[in-house]
Amino acid sequence: TTSPNAAGPGLILLTGATGYVGGRLLRALSERGQRVRCLARRPEALAARAPAGTEVVAGDCLRCETLAPALAGVHTAYYLVHSMAAGAAFEEQDRAAARNFGEAARTAGVRKIVYLGGLG
């Protein structure tokens, strides 16, 4: 992988690449020759199966300090992350993660966020 600071125009950040939709989107973007960086809580779980040329960085949308390096130089971000916590904590964690990501993306100058909503 390369350093997040090596980002150039057209860089895409993909969150949720270890999930069903994210994994397929990663493959499709890579097949189209897109430059893709993936944010993962456990990068080792993704790095071994990511297509060649994919940059995998550690981060968590609930930990704001991990987002700025991942978003550096990104043009478009795909937000495919949703909390799977049980009970009342689910909604608050999901909101907090999305809010953190949106604020960090705005600060980083990300031009477009594609948000996948999958729950009722």
Locate predicted features:
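N-terminal Rossmann NAD(P)H-binding glycine-rich loop of SDR-like oxidoreductase domains
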Residues: T2-Q34
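Structural motif
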Residues: L11, H75-T76, K112
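Conserved residues at beta->alpha junctions
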Residues: G16, A40, C61
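Active-site beta-alpha turn of Rossmann-fold NAD(P)-dependent dehydrogenases/reductases
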Residues: G16, V81, V114-G118
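Conserved glycine-rich Rossmann-like NAD(P)H-binding loop of the short-chain dehydrogenase/reductase
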Residues: Q34-R41
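NAD(P)H-binding glycine-rich loop region in Rossmannoid oxidoreductase-like domains
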Residues: E44-A108, L119-G120
